[in-house]
């Protein structure tokens, strides 16, 4: 990570009086996965983030893609009771309409509940217990998916 980015995070941490921790991830797992000019191997980091955070005794992860804009306080998401769920997700209506309304069948899903992986509230304990990262990585090793990590998380 460029020093300029680290300095920006340091500035934000001080300005808003919140800790910001930077984790440097070895991209060994993702070196041979598909990537494009807009979807790089760093896209796959979301798959292993819960495993990293679990070591820090964190039980919930609110994940936003970097292209998302939050206009209000996100602390409301901490109120969501996620104890019996692996994750809270948002259905990707726009994708299903633009891409193919039957895309879920192509992926072998049982219903059209295809979600956007750009916003996730993850129950870290259940995510790890259900081996989500390992299953997703195995799928990515075996097949090429048009929407890579988002497709395998939906599967």
Q: Which ranges hold each PLM region?
A:
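Active-site-proximal specificity loops/subdomain of glycosyltransferases
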Residues: 4-56
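Short, flexible loop segments at the rims of nucleotide/cofactor-binding pockets, characterized by
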Residues: 37-41, 97-98, 141-142
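Surface-exposed acidic, glycine/proline-enriched linker/cap segments
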Residues: 33, 95-110
């Amino acid at each position: 990570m460029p020093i300029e980015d680290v300095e920006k995070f340091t500035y934000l941490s001080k300005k808003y009086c919140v800790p910001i921790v930077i984790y440097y991830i070895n991209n060994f797992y993702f070196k041979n996965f598909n990537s494009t000019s807009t979807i790089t191997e760093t896209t796959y980091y979301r798959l292993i983030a819960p495993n990293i955070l679990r070591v820090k005794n964190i039980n919930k992860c609110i994940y936003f893609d970097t292209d998302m804009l939050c206009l209000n306080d996100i602390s409301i998401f901490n109120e969501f009771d996620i104890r019996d769920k692996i994750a809270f997700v948002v259905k990707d209506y726009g994708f299903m309409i633009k891409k193919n309304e039957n895309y879920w069948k192509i992926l072998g899903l049982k219903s059209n509940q295809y979600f956007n992986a750009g916003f996730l509230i993850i129950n870290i304990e259940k995510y790890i217990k259900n081996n989500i990262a390992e299953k997703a990585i195995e799928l990515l090793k075996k097949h090429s998916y048009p929407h890579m990590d988002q497709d395998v998380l939906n599967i």
